Amino acid sequence: MTQDIGDWAPYLSPEKNKDYFNSLLSFLNSRVGFEIYPPRGTWFRAFEYSSFSSTRVVILGQDPYHGEGQAEGLSFSVPRGMSIPPSLRNIYKELDQDDVDFTNPGHGHLENWAKQGVLLLNSVLTVEKNSPASHANQGWEVFTDQVITLLNDNKDNLVFLLWGAYANKKSVLIDSNKHLILSAAHPSPFSAHKGFFGCKHFSKTNSYLKASNQELIDWSLPL
């Protein structure tokens, strides 16, 4: 964990000394000859862009995009210049239908959300090229579950956006008396019509933030 993670460090640095994390690092080192996404220096970008103190919203993904050049260390986000992935296109469609200020920016780079305190967290932080879930069950899930637990225990009035069955399982880590849990189907083309479209999670997030005297999220993205 050499990447700068700012004020997350006191909370997350102890993880480095745990057996599961050492096993994870050994696994990653054993895969050094394979193409791993995102690039090593961006594995912890979600924490770099969204400080612990600023985090107000968590959008949980599963694992990074496995296509070349797509993953950049933020769930659902891709660098400018990359084609917008289908799930993110559907997120944009929902934003466009929701009661928030949003215009499709023509790119999939979500840094603007992250820097407002939207933690764009994948449950697994690495993947191998063209091999989805190739780094599942190696220890990342233990680490990111601990992230959710730390947020749950040390903060109040967070919003957790859990899309799809995988993300919804994480609700057991969250105290719904302290935080708002918004669950829906996954925005992928296979399931978006089963409850993601029309969920209005973005306006519901801001309504909750307003009610708890927090700054609203500007969901619009720079063109």
Name every feature range the model reports, one short phrase each.
Residues 7, 14-162, 166-169, 174-175, ...:
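A polyanion-binding, active-site-adjacent surface
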Residues 1-10:
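Short, extreme N-terminal leader segments that mark the start of a protein/domain
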Residues 196, 201:
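C-terminal substrate-binding/active-site "lid" region of AdoMet-derived donor-dependent transferases
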